[in-house]
Amino acid sequence: MLGDRKRKTGHTVLLITLLILSELFAGCGSQEKAGMSELLPTVREENRLVLYTSHKPEVYQPIVEEFENQTGIYVEIRDGGTTELMEDIQNFGKGTVDVMFGGGAESYNAYQHCFDRYESSASAKLNLPIAEEGGVWTPFSELPLVFIYNSRLVEENAAPKGWKQLLGDEKWKGQLAFADPGSSGTSVTILAAIPQILGEDPKICIPAFASQLDGKLCGGSADVVDSVENGTFRVGITLEETAKKRIAQGAPLAVIYPEDGTCIVPDATSIVSGAPHAANAGMFIDFTVSIPVQRLLQDQMYRRSVRRDLNAASPAEMKIVPFDYGWTAQHQDELMQIWADTQKAEREAADAVE
């Protein structure tokens, strides 16, 4: 079954490890894999795929290994943060990278000049409001933004019910976990979603949001859940699948669907312009939206399928605000500049007090 087989590429990596042990451990594991093609002369060029992914191994490994098993295509992987990988594709990816797998759809729109349009063989089965927005990307899963809180530290009736309360109530000042947008694609999505959900000028609501953080930022998206779980912060903003996964592992967390609405933003997959193995890249994208993979997302990964024939019902308390990809792409630089200016002003104010 999908996800149950051992990763055959792991055997190749193990062989390489035995041959060049010190060099491999000096590197970055899967990040080095994308540069190992010269060490694998037995793999024919037409049977390769170079994959960049911002997914965690528990997401990409079962999918990649089953793709390899079914197609005989060897997948070379480099993983990392969405922004880091997008920048690398922009600067060095043409002619060397085939696929970007993972990261919010709005990131693909911001870097759309780096990708080629591809219509999946399953496009007729995908949620049309998402697929029609696609442009250069194909959706992989639907990811609602949610609040989380530490259920040992915050009573249910005291938890923030919506964005206006989270941004306006002084009791959450300095108690809100949020990752640095410079390293977290999820945080970039959140910054873009807040003005759309509240219907406010970004120059007003983003500084108000930043003020609630009180100068405290988490290093990455995973740190948001960690810091709420361990009590460093009492509440946080994250993706539904991230929260549900941790709760299933026994974390003292609870999920809130904001009463004033939330956005469901898909993560995506796309073919890099100039992909050296473009046909294999198309096969991989088709595989990610196939019924077996999409069922795997729902059954084992706490994610929502993008297929109409597999969609699970949303919670009754979830009020969905459409995410405007065009507006986000047009204003992303402005949003990040507002954020940077706000952070600079807060640092200067803190220095003045000292």
Region locations from a protein language model:
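Short, low-complexity disordered leader/linker segments with a strong preference
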Residues: 1-48, 348-354
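Extracytoplasmic ligand-binding site segments that recognize negatively charged/polar headgroups
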Residues: 50-61, 80-86, 90, 94-232
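A bilobed periplasmic-binding-protein/Venus flytrap-type ligand-binding module shared by bacterial periplasmic
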Residues: 146-153, 195, 265-280, 296-297
